[in-house]
Amino acid sequence: MKISVANFKAIEQLDDYDLKPLTIISGANSGGKSSLIQLLLVIKQTLENNLGSQKLILNKPYVSLGKYKDIIFEGKSKNNLYWGLIFFNEDIPIAVKNSLFFKKINKGAIKKLEIQVKYKNNNSNLYIQEFFVEWQFETKGFTLFLHLNRERGSKYSVVTNSALFFKDEYIQYLKERVVSNSSLLIHDGWKANISFNKFFPFESTPTSSDEESEYTDEYFSSLANSFLEKVMSNYFSKISYLGPLRDEPRSFYTNDDDSTLKIGNKGEYAAHILEQKATNSVVFNKIKYYESGTIEYYDDKDTLENAVNYWICAVFKMAIRIKVNPIQSGMMYRIEILNDLGQKVPINHVGFGVSQILPIVVEGLISPSRSTLILEQPEIHLHPNVQSLLLDFIYSLVLSGKKIIVETHSDHFITRLRRRIAEGSSDVKKVNLTFVENKEYKVLKLTDSGSLEYWPQDFFDQLDKDIRAIVKAQSKKKNIAMLSNFKGDK
């Protein structure tokens, strides 16, 4: 999927940003790294909210951003929020692609679906200023598009090249009004009062003539628009998010029979999910290590509990064994860690490391193929070596068909990525490495040898600077000592 954004938080303009299987966003503090992630979460919580009249849900459950003026670039009311999404064939559910509706078109497979939404705020009344959707098919030159533009008052001009956006009873009337142009229907210049359900047009009161009113009431209640909603809802429902401050470990957890419980923004339900699904089978990747230090991934199938233990214990080496044990007749349960001394201790007795990485591993393993996992600063409370190994785990999820978006400050994480690309165990074509500098998103070009063609200023070069400073200081002290000894000999 590609995303375009204008006038959202720190982003003034970002065009066709490619969310690759592994997207890594880094940069200085307060530089705008989180803005793109926040927009994705705003769209997600808007789609999942039952209040269809709300055009944009800015607060809860995934992110809270305040009022509309708070999310506008530089807080200027003249700046109108815009976002656009491009879904490619692999992003579109099979049920939509194989539907009778699109087979009826008989123009080939869906190549991509594009949606653009532009907002305007007038006297604290947020409304959709412009809406555009286009279905593009593999057959050369064949598209279906609908463009709505609000001009004055609540009236929208309607431009489309297909009657398929409308109800069946309206199609015949539409055919009588439009003109033929290169075998495509053109309907231009008609105006209507249009209502939106979230981002989707769903009804209209015609404003041109009484003749039209017979046909156009709720004319957007069509399959074409319902499929648009299905594509978006399917994609965003498969997004899970783990914020930078994950839940603190507890001595025990209350049992909950809710099998639909999600991971939580802080990973607060990771223990519950592990307890509920411990014996569930998962397909995941393991690592084969070579003496040279290179690795090779291979598929495996095991229980969730064993898969979690493989990564946290065998790879990260943060414990000998992790196990969920029920207590008080199953009313509560405890996550116990078998440590290097052979002692079984509650998870809250072993520091923050295990509890911080547990939600990442659990959610990563149970997420389905074609899902998206967003991680903000996953390296917090982790040893540098584990930060490096975390990249190996995250890339294993990519190989399982999952999409990962990571915002990170970890040079260990990115250095490990470059190493794995150079060694050939990670594919550079699956990676988008972005550095945010002065609120500008700069995609860094990685070569297949793990090198960067452009190295931004202050991009993880502090370690090199400090090492050079240490060597310089050591050399200076050594020279002073030699000079002192030389004078003493005299």
Map each language-model feature to its residues:
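Extended helical coiled-coil dimerization/tether regions that scaffold
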Residues: 189, 213-349, 482-490
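Short, polar loop/linker segments at the starts of domains and inter-domain junctions
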Residues: 20, 96-99, 253-267, 448-451
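Contiguous hydrophobic segments
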Residues: 103-109, 151-192, 252, 268-275, ...
